[in-house]
From Swiss-Prot:
GO terms for molecular function: ATP binding; cysteine-glucosaminylinositol ligase activity; cysteine-tRNA ligase activity; zinc ion binding. Monomer. Pfam families: tRNA-synt_1e. A motif ('HIGH' region) lies at residues 49-59. InterPro entries: Cys-tRNA/MSH_ligase, Mycothiol_ligase_MshC, Rossmann-like_a/b/a_fold, tRNA-synt_1_cat_dom, tRNAsynth_Ia_anticodon-bd. It comes from Corynebacterium jeikeium (strain K411). The gene is mshC1. This is L-cysteine:1D-myo-inositol 2-amino-2-deoxy-alpha-D-glucopyranoside ligase 1. Signal peptide: none annotated.
Amino acid sequence: MHAWPDPSVPVVAGTPVPLKLFDTADQRVKEVDTTPDANGEVGMYVCGITPYDSTHLGHAATYLTFDLAQRQLLANGHKVHYAQNITDVDDPLFERAERDGVDWRELGTSQINLFRSDMEILSVIPPRDYIGAMESVDEVIAMVQQLLDAGAAYELDQGDIYASIDATEQFGYESNLDRATMEEYFAERGGDPDREGKRDPLDALIWRGHREGEPAWDSPFGPGRPGWHVECSAIATNRLGSHFAIQGGGSDLAFPHHEFSAAHAEAALKVERMAGHYVHAGMIALDGVKMSKSLGNLVFVHKLSEAGHDPSAIRLAVFAGHYREDRDFSDAILAEAEERLTRWREQLAGEVSEAEATEVVDKLRAILADDLNTPEALSLLDGAAGDCNQIIATALDGLLGVRI
């Protein structure tokens, strides 16, 4: 599946600073391991959308977070292999299509196209590999078979296959949650703890046997379709290898999704840890209330663009808070971002020496390399007195995706 057009990302002046990010598993900010993988690159996998509804600013903020991370790595001279999935076969998609009286494939295609458009508007660097679940069924089948062969999975009635949480000794390391919290989140976030016959309530579905009216693919263990978590396990490791630098997504994916996608890969491929960093972006609220379709308070990127808002201002509005924090979005915050962008354009029209401009860029690099500290980065630029040969403007484009 194709992604979206690649924005032009300029080469940034100044001294590279190693990128440090907060790792949910280790519960600390630590340097990203940029040791080249088998492809000679730094691997980054970010979980994509389930295309059953329009993507909103809360989704976009997550992808902007990892766009920032990739930009810092690129500015440091690293080659980045960025992969992302699209869960284009899943229950929420079928349920929404049935409710709206449309074909689930058509619904998925329309929402994927809208997501692509939003990412292009925001100048997000696209993944090299943009892979739908339907494209990766053979890969999932192979991983499910590996888990069965390793005794890490078992079959129940209706052709359903589950992975055992005790298949690896380290299960739970990624999210650091206690058992009670795991059970609570598992029930709330798509799990089926009450499924009869499961060895453990937390065991996760990796292959759903065929049900009437649902799409299915043939496999050695019967017709069916992939489970959500193992889909990401297979897509990520088949492109980035059994161990890669960054696994990313929203904070609501830390458990169960990222915990299980890591566990499935580790059990199947016999590795201790799938990703060096598990990085999670906070949630976005509108005027203090979490964005929800049921509340009718979603903010859509394409609507903001159609209303004439500068994409660079939208980025600045998101970057006004730290990526790990649950934070607010409002008309006032967007207006402040637009005013800030106007001030920067006026300030940077002034002239300073090359040494002064380079000093600003070096400080900007250091601030962003420290766990993507965008609030401090914006404060730094607020004090910029001018530019020299667009050294600062180029750095803003390359590091923040903000165009002066």
